[in-house]
């Protein structure tokens, strides 16, 4: 099959990330460093609702969960990017990168600093692609509470087709106009399920449906909070009223909607935006996993 050539080279880079082609073996953490601190990890296939859950949890008085840190992915640690997203002192970030013998140790220093900065008790990392790194996360943070956000694959694929919908150019959010190949969209969802569902049964792993989060918000957040080890707080429902660095849309331009009030408008949107033959292909390839997740296609 002839490879598609995209007008915007960033689009191919995005598709490569979906397949984790940017992961580098030299950035793998082969150390024996272990932290027994409780942390939580929000992850899942992109466009499943991880950012919405992230800002809700970040509104809890005891929890902190900022934009994607990428710290658990085998990528180069970039202090400047972390400073821009989290406002942890740049000199400290650079110092840890020089001194730490492992990225897990760096992550521990980072979480302690960010917790102190935000005056919270438990750090959470929301990076969608952590879904491909659960075993590695538990290797260094055995008490990590994994929250796997899942969603009807038809809606995920529908959303992935135009991802990334926006990018930041000269400090401004602008549309990309991208249309992604259906095969890549389905493949990304399947890859996430391949890498996560065999951890079912692990007491530190839970699944949460996006649909439950927006249709039965309090019960769903109560279950998530219990998994993390805290009580649900009513203020979590007011997540969209919070203004802070962690909610700056320029730091996560693909997920601007996550800072707005809860809406059910995206449920079933595939019916309007996917062609019949596309729906048939999505159902054919995702059916078995979807049934396991409790979806009827």
PLM features per residue range, with description:
Residues 54, 111, 134, 221, ...:
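Generic structural marker for isolated residues within well-ordered, non-membrane alpha-helices
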Residues 1-108, 117:
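PAPS-dependent sulfotransferase catalytic core
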Residues 1-41, 161-165, 169-170, 178-179, ...:
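PAPS-dependent sulfotransferases, especially Golgi type II membrane carbohydrate sulfotransferases
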Residues 77-87, 117-237, 242-261:
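PAPS-dependent sulfotransferase catalytic domain
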């Amino acid at each position: 099959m002839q490879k598609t050539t995209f007008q915007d080279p960033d689009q191919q880079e995005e598709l490569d990330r979906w397949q984790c082609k940017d992961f580098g073996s030299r950035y793998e953490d082969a150390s024996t460093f272990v932290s027994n601190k409780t942390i939580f990890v929000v992850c899942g296939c992109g466009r499943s609702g991880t950012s919405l859950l992230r800002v809700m949890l970040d509104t809890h008085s005891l929890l902190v969960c900022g934009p994607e840190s990428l710290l658990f992915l085998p990528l180069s640690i970039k202090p400047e990017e972390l400073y821009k997203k989290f406002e942890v002192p740049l000199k400290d970030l650079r110092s840890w990168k020089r001194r730490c013998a492992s990225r897990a140790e760096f992550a521990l220093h980072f979480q302690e600093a960010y917790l102190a900065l935000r005056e919270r008790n438990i750090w959470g990392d929301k990076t969608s692609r952590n879904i491909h790194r659960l075993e590695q996360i538990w290797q260094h943070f055995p008490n990590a509470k994994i929250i796997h956000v899942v969603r009807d694959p038809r809606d995920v694929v529908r959303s992935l087709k135009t991802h990334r919908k926006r990018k930041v150019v000269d400090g401004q959010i602008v549309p990309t106009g991208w249309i992604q190949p259906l095969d890549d969209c389905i493949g990304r969802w399947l890859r996430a399920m391949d890498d996560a569902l065999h951890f079912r049964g692990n007491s530190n792993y839970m699944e949460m449906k996006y649909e439950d989060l927006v249709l039965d918000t309090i019960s769903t957040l109560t279950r998530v909070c219990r998994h993390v080890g805290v009580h649900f707080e009513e203020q979590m429902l007011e997540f969209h009223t919070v203004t802070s660095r962690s909610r700056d849309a320029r730091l996560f331009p693909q997920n601007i909607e996550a800072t707005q009030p809860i809406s059910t408008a995206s449920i079933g949107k595939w019916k309007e935006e996917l062609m019949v033959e596309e729906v048939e292909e999505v159902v054919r390839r995702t059916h078995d996993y979807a049934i396991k997740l409790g979806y009827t296609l």
